[in-house]
Amino acid sequence: MEINKFRALSRRAQQLHYTSLNGLKRRCNNAHGAANFHSLKRATQTQIQKSQTKPLLKCGDSDIKEWNVAISSYMRTGRCNEALRVFKRMPRWSSVSYNGMISGYLRNGEFELARKLFDEMPERDLVSWNVMIKGYVRNRNLGKARELFEIMPERDVCSWNTMLSGYAQNGCVDDARSVFDRMPEKNDVSWNALLSAYVQNSKMEEACMLFKSRENWALVSWNCLLGGFVKKKKIVEARQFFDSMNVRDVVSWNTIITGYAQSGKIDEARQLFDESPVQDVFTWTAMVSGYIQNRMVEEARELFDKMPERNEVSWNAMLAGYVQGERMEMAKELFDVMPCRNVSTWNTMITGYAQCGKISEAKNLFDKMPKRDPVSWAAMIAGYSQSGHSFEALRLFVQMEREGGRLNRSSFSSALSTCADVVALELGKQLHGRLVKGGYETGCFVGNALLLMYCKCGSIEEANDLFKEMAGKDIVSWNTMIAGYSRHGFGEVALRFFESMKREGLKPDDATMVAVLSACSHTGLVDKGRQYFYTMTQDYGVMPNSQHYACMVDLLGRAGLLEDAHNLMKNMPFEPDAAIWGTLLGASRVHGNTELAETAADKIFAMEPENSGMYVLLSNLYASSGRWGDVGKLRVRMRDKGVKKVPGYSWIEIQNKTHTFSVGDEFHPEKDEIFAFLEELDLRMKKAGYVSKTSVVLHDVEEEEKERMVRYHSERLAVAYGIMRVSSGRPIRVIKNLRVCEDCHNAIKYMARITGRLIILRDNNRFHHFKDGSCSCGDYW
């Protein structure tokens, strides 16, 4: 009964499709009729599809053709299991049956099932081999495709073209050429595939040689080579080639117009636009996009308003112009009147709001999206991450996974960046594992995000291991490692990386020299740092900016050369900013130069009156000098100006759970155990020679109370908890939102020595590696 029903519906649908529609089409001679025709055609095709997906359950039917049609119908709608049930119930199989199953499996991503069925075929025809090879090529598994290709009993031009196109589309140009040269017979597809391979991989010299070696190229081939010149920004050669074309179509004109626009020659582009004998919506869109790329948004809008018709690309191009110019009000007005929006439209608006810091507007649009793609998720995650909403970014990443969103490199990169910001090393490692499992190569884009995550999370060794494995390294990769080792206090290692980078032929940039000067500062290499600073313009073309000067002030200040540092600031080609004055203030505190510290502080308070950190630095210097009256005055000044000291917090991640501590923390569920452990540890530290530095504590407090107050600082509580709960042999990683206090720094050195643990503390300035009673910072931070 089921098979008869299927036959009747199928015949009825086919009759309607091939007879009624053809007759109707002949009668549709106007635009309205054509629209009706296409509408009816779509409706009929839907009816056919529904009729062809009826299940076939009756056994013993001898009409193999109808069984094969049913298999094809199920496979087209992704119902592989139903197709397999039909296949198993067939009275017999033909090569068409097998090929339908194999191609269906491949279309639905079931490569193992396709290969299994292919291997089980009692007899394969040429179509079977070609289908299987094409499936591997589409999946970019060229190795498997090549294996099958080499053992084929016979090949036709389709077989050769499949391998040729596979190599061409995946950038294997030499392999594509090898296949091309071996082909016993070539057709237009073969020649165009190789030409496209050369063009897509920017091998224009080879493309031109191939083009000259043959006559009678089709227009599509001429346009392909023209597009290659444009892609390489060889606009002169593109124009010469364009002028030599005997026949041009709208694609030719659109390509050359785009080329001029992308090269910044917008007037020439407009002249070609006006001369174009035929213009379609893409011609107009190319010109609008050209204006936008050249920051001529008003001209773009004027042309946009004149367009005889617009498509989604046109609307999105104009929208992107407003977003790039951060004119979000105009973008919103355009967005609201758009007759058609696709996922790219929504993504553009979300990205625009996020980049302008309007994260709530971005999230509001994100929630309203009818459909999201990986770019949508990545844009929203990046928006949260870049605006400092780190935990929201991670929460959204987890939500994306739960909802089945497809991960891409951008979403991984944003999530890794967020892990770096909140120092979530364990989560970062899990993401690294997901990347490896997902088959993502550790190339520059994702690899650099991983490097930064490991460096910022205090795992410089794992960063180094990853760096060695990276397939491709760019200037960002090297800069990350140089800056990472520098910030961790291993300046000499950082400088070795710098020398290696130069040997690799990479030219240092601004960021490189900031990291190098910082490494010299942390290592105490004053003369070497001066040499780099005064020769980097001549040697590398890097002009000193405020960051480079700040590094030099830190270098000189760290060495106690405070007057030299101050004189350097006086001779700067621009006024020192608050960061540079803050560096001088920090150096003055370390070396006890109160007068220079006050000068620096006054400058900072004028620039950043609410910078509580600088008040604290100066207050600590006064306290260390016993100037308690000045401490009191400074606190009154802070109160009058409404400046509040940022509370200090420290946290540690243990088994994917973050434990946060404040000074004298009374809320942690294990506080009694932690305090008791600290009391016991404090006794052992004193026996080893530790003396509490209480000079920064208020002078009207008893000495014993002073010791108790510094003992329960947040960083010491976090370190103690880490010693208690992190298994032996693993480093203890603690983060503090402020600069570590002098007494805690000294105490943690003793804690590391007594317990034999490696303690890595990241404060708001740098990393401290405590081991065997010493710190990588050399007691200067």
UniProtKB/Swiss-Prot annotation:
Location of region: Type DYW motif: 687-781
PPR repeats: 63-93, 94-128, 129-155, 156-190, 191-217, 218-248, 249-279, 280-314, 315-341, 342-376, 377-407, 408-442, 443-473, 474-508, 509-544, 545-575
Region (Type E(+) motif): 656-686
Alphabetized GO MF terms: RNA binding; zinc ion binding
Gene Ontology BP terms: acquisition of seed longevity; RNA modification; seed coat development
Entry keyword set: Repeat
Pfam families: DYW_deaminase, E_motif, PPR, PPR_1, PPR_2
PROSITE patterns recorded: PPR (PS51375)
InterPro entries (alphabetical): DYW_dom (IPR032867), E_motif (IPR046848), Pentatricopeptide_rpt (IPR002885), PPR_At4g14850-like_plant (IPR046960), TPR-like_helical_dom_sf (IPR011990)
Region (Type E motif): 580-655
Acyltransferase listed as a keyword: no
The family this protein is said to belong to: Belongs to the PPR family. PCMP-H subfamily.
Name this protein carries in UniProt: Pentatricopeptide repeat-containing protein At4g02750
Record organism: Arabidopsis thaliana
